[in-house]
Structures are given as C-alpha cells and as structure tokens.
C-alpha cells in the first residue's frame, strides 16, 4: 500500500513518537493573551514563547499527521495527501530533534527552524485540494460529509499553527510597524482593511472582465480595534470578489449600470460586524447548504492533475477550487467570530462577517 511505503521513509521510532505526542493535550491561546504577552518582546519573553512552542507545536503537528494517515475512502492513499502527510512528519521530526531551549542563542536557532517549517507548509491548502479532487472523481456526494469535517478540523488547526509560528517570528522584527504586536495590529481600522481588500478584488475583476462594479463603504473611519489585518484582508477579499463576480455576470449584457457593492462596518459592544451586500441575483435556496463545503465547487481547479509533487511552488490561490468561503469562515471562527450568508434568489446576497471585539476567545482546538 502507498501509505505503508511512505511511512517506511521514516523510522518506526518517529512514527511511535508521533502517536505519543498526538495523544497529549493542546493548549489554546487567545488574541488578547498574544497581544499582552507580545507587547514586551524582551529576551526573557521570547525565551518563554519559544519554550511553549517547543512543546505545543509537536502536539498539534502530530495530531494532524495521525489524521492524515487514517482518512476514509482511500484519501490517505492519494499522492497529494501523502505529500502533505510527509511534510507534517518532516516538521514533527525537526521539532522533536531540537534540543531543550535554555538561552537566547537556542531561541534564535529555534526561531529559524520554525520559520523553515512554516515555509515547508506554504502549499498545504492547494495540495490537499488536489488530493480531494483526485478522490472526488470516484465518489458520490453522500460520502463526502466525513471528508468535509476532516478538512474543517485540518485547516482550522493549520491556521492556528501558522498564527503561533508567525506571531513568534514577527516579534523578532527590530522595526515593527506602529501599533503592531507581531501579526496583531492593536489599532486596526476595519474600514481601511475593507478598502484595501476591495481594491485588490476590483483589480482582479477588471483583469477578468474589463470592468468592475463600484464599491461603497460605510462606517466610522476613525474606529479601530485589535485584530490580525492579514486575516481580515483575506476574508474581505473573498467576500467582495464573490459579490463582484455575481454582479458582473448578472449585468454583463444589460443596458443598466451594474449596482454597487455595499460594505457596512458596525462596531458593537461584543462584535465588530461587516456586511457585504450585492445585487448579483442571489443563490438558490437549494444551493445554500453547499456554499461552505470544499467539495462541490463548479469552478475549474487551477491545479493540474499532472502537477509534479516534488515541486514546492504549486500556485498558492484560493480562486478556482471553491475554498474561499469555508476557509474564510474558519479564519473568522479562529478568534471567536463567524461568517453567515443570507441570500435572496432573484435579487442578491448579504454576507455578515462577525469579528469578536473582546479578543478573549480561546483558539478552537480540533
């Protein structure tokens, strides 16, 4: 079997160690804790952070490696999934081989090692998409719920691993931008992020269609709160891109001017909520349950079937294989928020992105 062959690349002792660490308890971290702890990146704090990651990251990586070996319907045997599983095993091996962190020299070496781990895992999402696509061809849709639940757990865990590594690495930046603590912006303007994401999405729309609907943004431009701008940009880009495409395709042959996309930013006591509204014709009610799945996209997969699995630069993109909405919802949920879609077939769609303003939600730990 392919799984057995792949495992033979790694010593039996490593596989046993993976199972041992995969049974250990994970420790969740809140946005507020990351912000407060990282606000003083002293040598001592960086040492404490590295010591925590030295114990925590192998647990999280081991859990995913075990799950990648035991997927249903033969998904574990797909070449793309085997490649991802090998990345996780290699990263686990590197982390476990790293000695106890005792001083700042150890901490700096550890930071370089986990930076390399993060780079190794850059293409996990498109590679897993390729594996699922290889599996999907021979399955009926009734068997895909279990795969979907696995992918939710897997990608949520990946967001957490990359956040922990990225936050620690970024704390070493000798010249951090104003009001930033690692990846976190303590005074992030959701209006500004929404504007930047909208401009990026419109440029893609112009490239594909030659024109793009207007986007109007409403809210208090002076309002700020602590959040991770890269996460919000990713979510807003996906929502706006979907709305632009829907409106553009609905009005492409119409004499009417395409109506604008409307973005409203509301700052509540518990949540910051961003609504993205379009008049792109909406989604049929029968199709709504499928918009958050990874498995029913009608768009063309940008990854070619004959991709060389030895090459590390598979194109990193979410466009084309239907991962934008489910991944965006996971990013929202990672820090205690959510994403809801309400559609009116024949008119348009409203997307509600809820972001926890309190910042004290523990990471969800799948």
Curated annotation (Swiss-Prot):
Pfam assignment, any one: HATPase_c
Binding-site residues, ATP: 238-245, 278, 297-298, 320-325
pH dependence: Optimum pH is 7-7.5.
Reaction equations catalysed: L-seryl-[pyruvate dehydrogenase E1 alpha subunit] + ATP = O-phospho-L-seryl-[pyruvate dehydrogenase E1 alpha subunit] + ADP + H(+)
EC number: 2.7.11.2
Nucleotide-binding listed as a keyword: yes
Source organism: Arabidopsis thaliana
Subunit relationships: Homodimer.
Role according to the record: Serine protein kinase that inhibits the mitochondrial pyruvate dehydrogenase (PDH) complex (mtPDC) by phosphorylation of the E1 alpha subunit on Ser residues, thus contributing to the regulation of glucose metabolism.
Protein's name in the database: [Pyruvate dehydrogenase (acetyl-transferring)] kinase, mitochondrial
One BP annotation, GO: protein autophosphorylation
Any single Gene Ontology cellular-component annotation: cytosol
A GO molecular-function descriptor: protein homodimerization activity
């Amino acid at each position: 079997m392919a799984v057995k062959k792949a495992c033979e690349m790694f010593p039996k002792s490593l596989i046993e160690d993976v199972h041992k660490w995969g049974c250990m308890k994970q420790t969740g971290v809140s946005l507020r804790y990351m912000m407060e702890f990282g606000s003083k990146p002293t040598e001592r704090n960086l040492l404490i952070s590295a010591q925590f990651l030295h114990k925590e990251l192998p647990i999280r990586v081991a859990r995913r490696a075990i799950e990648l070996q035991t997927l249903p319907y033969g998904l574990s045997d797909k070449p793309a999934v085997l490649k991802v599983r090998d990345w996780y095993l290699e990263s686990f091996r590197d982390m476990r081989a790293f000695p106890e962190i005792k001083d700042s020299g150890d901490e700096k070496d550890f930071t370089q090692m986990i930076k390399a781990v993060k780079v190794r895992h850059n293409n996990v999402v498109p590679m897993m998409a390729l594996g699922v696509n290889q599996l999907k061809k021979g399955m009926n849709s009734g068997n895909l719920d279990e795969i979907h639940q696995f992918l939710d757990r897997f990608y949520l865990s990946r967001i957490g691993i990359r956040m922990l590594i990225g936050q620690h690495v970024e704390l070493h930046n000798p010249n951090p931008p104003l009001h930033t603590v690692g990846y976190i912006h303590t005074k992030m303007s959701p209006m500004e992020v929404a504007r930047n994401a909208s401009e990026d999405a419109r440029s893609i729309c112009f490239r594909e269609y030659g024109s793009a609907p207007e986007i109007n943004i409403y809210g208090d431009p002076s309002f700020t709160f602590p959040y991770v701008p890269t996460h919000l940009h990713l979510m807003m880009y996906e929502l706006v891109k979907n709305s632009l495409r829907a409106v553009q395709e609905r009005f492409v042959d119409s004499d009417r001017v395409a109506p604008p996309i409307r973005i409203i930013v509301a700052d509540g006591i518990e949540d910051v909520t961003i609504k993205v509204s379009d008049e792109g014709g909406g989604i049929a009610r029968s199709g709504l349950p499928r918009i958050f799945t990874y498995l029913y996209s009608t768009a063309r997969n940008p990854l070619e079937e004959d991709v060389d699995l030895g090459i590390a630069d598979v194109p990193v993109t979410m466009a084309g294989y239907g991962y934008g909405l489910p991944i965006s919802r996971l990013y929202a949920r990672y820090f205690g928020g959510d994403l809801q879609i309400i559609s009116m077939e024949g008119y348009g769609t409203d997307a509600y992105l809820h972001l926890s303003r309190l910042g004290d939600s523990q990471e969800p730990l799948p």
